[in-house]
Amino acid sequence: MEKEVWRFIDSGNCSPAFNMALDEALLEWHSEGKIPPTIRFYGWNPPTLSIGYFQKVEKEIDMEAVKKYGLGFVRRPTGGRGVLHDQELTYSVIVSELHPAMPQTVTEAYRVISQGILEGFRFLGLDAYFAVPKTEEEKADLKNPRSAVCFDAPSWYELVVEGRKVAGSAQTRQKGVILQHGSILLHLDEDMLFSLFKYPNERVKERLRQNFKNKAVAINELTDRNITINEAKEAFFRGFEKGLNVQLERYELTDDELFYVQQLAKNKYETDEWNFKR
């Protein structure tokens, strides 16, 4: 049987506003039937703190620290918590809710899409599996996250490699389309990450930091060899093809598409109204 062909875009390192605008545009174009399901890889220039759609900047984020480090800042159209995008491979998957391979529930769709990530880790020679919360306490933890830091708690079907969470993902559904995007960390600057959020006091900050160490890990902490961004791209490209049983076809945006995304970035994702609205 011939495999279904999905589109693949590697947009390289882009501005925070452009990155979010392109994800939104792909969702829109797919909902209008203009493009097939799409998988996109990207990076960030400058390194960026992205926050979840529902987060309150004033209450949770130390904007002075964001400025001090020269980081970009953007609010995502997806939920979840704060993510520092630096040395990582970021991916997004855009596919119709009605696609025959997509289960109806968010959790199950998350598992199906994340199968591509799981296979990618295996191509890198790492033992990856899905964590499912078993105890009532673990389930309660999911509903009441203890901190604004996204990698703090594995969520349903979170990917765990060698017992530690490696890939954080968020999902939204709009116009009948699923957008899931997430981060695959190669390296992580923990000091920087923990200085970007507000805490009731130093003790809480330290406790969260210790917890975090046991739960979150970057790929290059798990292996002796240094995995480059290009190696990661290759592994996860193959991983998505295998995990979703599709053939990925590389695609470059047209000038018109590029212009549309740039306008959306400027008029929405670069504005204070969007980024600081809550």
Swiss-Prot record:
Signal peptide: none annotated. The active site is at C150. Its EC number is 2.3.1.181. In the reaction, the free carboxyl group of octanoic acid is attached via an amide linkage to the epsilon-amino group of a specific lysine residue of lipoyl domains of lipoate-dependent enzymes. The reaction proceeds via an octanoyl-thioester enzyme intermediate. Belongs to the octanoyltransferase LipM family. Keywords: Acyltransferase, Transferase. It catalyses: octanoyl-[ACP] + L-lysyl-[protein] = N(6)-octanoyl-L-lysyl-[protein] + holo-[ACP] + H(+). PANTHER family: OCTANOYL-[GCVH]:PROTEIN N-OCTANOYLTRANSFERASE (PTHR43679:SF2), OCTANOYLTRANSFERASE LIPM-RELATED (PTHR43679). It comes from the Bacteria. The gene is lipM. Catalyzes the transfer of endogenously produced octanoic acid from octanoyl-acyl-carrier-protein onto the lipoyl domain of GcvH, an intermediate carrier during protein lipoylation. Monomer. This is Octanoyltransferase LipM. It comes from Anoxybacillus flavithermus (strain DSM 21510 / WK1). Pathway: Protein modification; protein lipoylation via endogenous pathway; protein N(6)-(lipoyl)lysine from octanoyl-[acyl-carrier-protein].
